[in-house]
Amino acid sequence: MKKKILCTILSSMLAVSLLAGCSNKTTDATNSKSKTVSIKDVMGTSEIPENPKKVVILTNEGVEALLTLGVKPVGAVTGVTGDWYKHTKSELADVKPVGKEKAPNLEAIAALKPDLIIGNKMRHEKIYTQLKAIAPTVFSDTIRGSWKDNFKFYAEVLNKKAEGDKALKEYESKVNSIKKDFKDKLDTKISLVRFMDGKTRIYLGDTFAGTILKEIGFKRPDTQQGTKFVNEIGKERLNEADGDVMFYFTYELGDGKGLAREKEWLNDPMFKSLNVVKNNKAFKVNDTIWNTAGGIKAANLMLDDLNKMLREGKF
């Protein structure tokens, strides 16, 4: 009889213990699934997962940020020609393309069932409501010279502040090395020119390359001062493109029109008469790295370009 009572008591205790264990696991799973943080962005305040697992990123500079922070997105926008950029391609295996930066594919995004979407107000404000209906959505503000601000924002959103601080410190160390090693070159007035289909632009202070040159300490020609974005010029204003050194880059979409514009202008007698051209100080650089990609990986590669040219004595 005593054995029977003891067995009954032990069985009851085991059952209670198992139920409690199951209850705790259920509670833990629920808490884990529902744990969110409030993030304030340019669109307001949003509740997002504390540690998102399935992120869709809608800007190319954002793609670079995520990869640098150790976060592989489930979906990302492609480069302007519909392919991954060469400098990030190897890290994007198995990532699903979701359209281009200026025209994300909402159906492709929804099919991935993301738990977080990261976009940009300048690019995606018109589809914000639709994105928000798919998953929690946050936006950086603009895409111009503010890549560092955006990078810090992405690090905050992804709960990767330590990784972000480390990456920026490494970038700034490279900047400081150039400043130190080539301090006698910092008075060089650098001109930035971009050729596009039907357009020629001078890139000013509030551009990706412009902010990096300023951070290093390089000067700009008198015609390229200030913090504006770009000046579009015709050949009658070619003198504004002159400088001690010129870096030019061409926005080519695969139809040959950007390259045709470059060829036309480079062969023009007025262009050839610029002092920077006559002194053989006009250098073509990669448009993706110096402008279009616009992220931390491109920034580091631009520094590498400058460092290499300086060490080779090109300017």
How would you label these PLM feature ranges?
Residues K126-D197, A293-F315:
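Extracytoplasmic substrate-binding proteins
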Residues S11-S17:
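Bacterial N-terminal signal peptides
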Residues I5, L18-S34:
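Bacterial lipoprotein signal-peptidase II cleavage site
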Residues V245-F315:
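Structured C-terminal subdomain patch of bacterial secreted/periplasmic proteins
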Residues K54-L66, D165-K219:
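Basic- and aromatic-lined ligand-binding clefts that recognize polyanionic substrates
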Residues M1-I9:
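Bacterial N-terminal signal peptides that target proteins for export
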Residues E61-A108:
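A short, structured surface patch at a secondary-structure boundary
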Residues K113-I118, P136, G243-D244:
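Proline-aspartate-enriched helix->loop->beta-strand connector
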